[in-house]
């Protein structure tokens, strides 16, 4: 019986260590960390390799009138966000997006975020499914239907572009 218990424990340890999580992180020779797969912003907040996230988040001050509008208009909106932790545009726009949705009280459960490699490929075919060729891409959904996108960079600022997309809906 003890022998069986040891085998079961060994199996569980091996099985637990062999599985691949929802994302992978690879480090390039110059130190850039690339996240590929589904992850949350807590990864960006907790890993010092992504210091650009906190500094750009803190530096951004969105328009208060836009935040007031978005607080009501975005409550039933869901997002798919695709970015590259290696990409300059992602480093600028992703923190602004998260500050905007945080101040608008959008729940984390309404946001799915995926990292891609330098070829802009995801682990699960998401980039092909949604035709993503540039990052970052912010896709907005309402009632399961796509209502708009922000691709690569904003035109008027994150909060203003989100307001514009929601008013077109």
Language-model features, listed with the residues they occupy:
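Sec-dependent signal peptide recognition
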Residues: 2-10
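C-terminal motif of bacterial Sec signal peptides marking the signal peptidase cleavage site
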Residues: 13-16
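Non-globular targeting/processing and membrane-anchoring segments
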Residues: 18-64, 68-73, 163-165, 169
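Thiol-based oxidoreductase modules, predominantly thioredoxin-like and allied folds used
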Residues: 79-85, 108-122
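Conserved redox-active cysteine motifs that mediate thiol-disulfide chemistry
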Residues: 85-93
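Thioredoxin-like thiol-disulfide oxidoreductase module
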Residues: 113-134, 165-166
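Non-catalytic, surface beta->alpha helical segment in thiol-disulfide oxidoreductase systems
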Residues: 134, 140-169
